[in-house]
Amino acid sequence: MNTKSLAPSALTVVAFIFCMVLVMRPTVVSGASMMPTLHDKDVLIASPLAKRLFQPTRGDIVTVCLSANPLCGFVFSGDTQYVKRLVGVPGDVVRYGTCNIFVTTRTGQKVKDTEPTMVCQDRDEFKQIVLRERMYFVAGDNRGNSLDSRIFGPVSKSQINATVLAQIRLTWTP
């Protein structure tokens, strides 16, 4: 076997793995928690590199993993990865109920929740949390049908796997 012919193939495999781990990672939406923005089975292109190069920003759609597994997000990892909108950043005061989320920045500015949400009505008392450094509040756009920071609490920056860059909706009707 000629080792010169193997070198380009090996280099291609290494480049592909590098891209999948650091640059772009395909993710499939599972469920309706991000409706109407994202639909079940939408394919997303998420970038772990963008998360490392830029500070996560309010309004970003991110992938989040609650486990400490560094391979979370890969198909074979077995861990659940969530796709959510980042609504609260470090220093924010977040007040939330079943559906509504109210954010006040560290400078006292009230942030209007303008992201699309499905119809929902608050059923319980509002809770309040102040986000510490490197802590973020994430929520699904479909607030009445989302497992998010209102349930599992704020997430740390290390639990944010990637920032979503693009969405591909694959539909087929015969």
Segments and roles (model prediction):
Residues M1-V13:
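N-terminal Sec-pathway targeting helices
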Residues L6, C19-V28, M34-P174:
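Soluble "head" domains of membrane/secretory-pathway proteins
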